Amino acid sequence: MSVCPAPRSPVRWLHAFTLCLLLAVLAGCVSVPKPMAGAGEDVFSRVGRFAITVTESDGKQQAVQGGFAWRDDGGSYLLDLTNPLGSTEARVEGRPGMAVLTRANGERLAAEHPDALAEDALGSPVPVTGLRDWLRGRLMAGAAPDGLERDAQGRPTAFEQDGWNARLSRYDAQGPQLLVLQRQEPGRRILVRLVITQP
C-alpha cells in the first residue's frame, strides 16, 4: 500500500484507516496476538477480514482489504493489521490514557485516546472506541443510538452512533460475525465491512 503525498487523498485516507482499525481490522494467515500480561477472564478476541471502500462524490472509488486480529481484556487491547498476504502492516496497542500505532517500518504514532490517534492519522473521526463495543455486539456507551433495531434475542442489529450507520449480523456467543459500517462525509462515502473468521 502506497501513501499519496496529498494529505486528504483517498489512497492516504484508506491507508491510514487500514492502519488504525479499526476500525477496526484481517485472512487465514493471521494469528491471534499473544496473551496480554495480567489478562483476566474478560479477555475477548476476534480474528477476521476487512474491506474498506471510499466512494468520492464524482464516483471514483478506492478500496483496500486485509486481515485483523483483535485481543481485548477490557482495560487494554492489541490490534494487529495484515495485508492480504498475511504480513503485518501495523499494531495498535491501547490502554486507558494511551494509544500507540506501530507500523511495519517502525514508525510510531501516539495519542491519549484511540479516537484521537485515528483522527490524527486520518484527518477525520473514526469510532475506534465504538468498534470495541460493536465487535462484542453492544452499543457504545455515552452515545445514544438512532434507529436502533434488535433481533429476537435483544441484540442490536442496526443503528446509527457517532455518525456511523452500523449493521451487525451472524451472531455467535461473542458477538456479530459480520459488521457493515457506513459513514457519509462531505464529498465521500465510507463503507467498512468486517467478517469474523475465528472467535
Swiss-Prot record:
Residues bearing a lipid moiety (N-palmitoyl cysteine): 29
NCBIfam families: lolB
Family indicated by similarity: Belongs to the LolB family.
Keyword Transport (UniProt): yes
Oligomeric form and interacting partners: Monomer.
Keyword annotations: Cell outer membrane, Chaperone, Lipoprotein, Membrane, Palmitate, Protein transport, Signal, Transport
Compartmental location: Cell outer membrane
Predominant cellular place of this UniProt entry's protein: membrane
Protein name as it appears in the record: Outer-membrane lipoprotein LolB
Lipid positions (S-diacylglycerol cysteine): 29
GO biological process, one term: protein transport
Entry function: Plays a critical role in the incorporation of lipoproteins in the outer membrane after they are released by the LolA protein.
InterPro entries according to UniProt: LolA/LolB/LppX, OM_lipoprot_LolB
Recorded topology in the membrane: Lipid-anchor
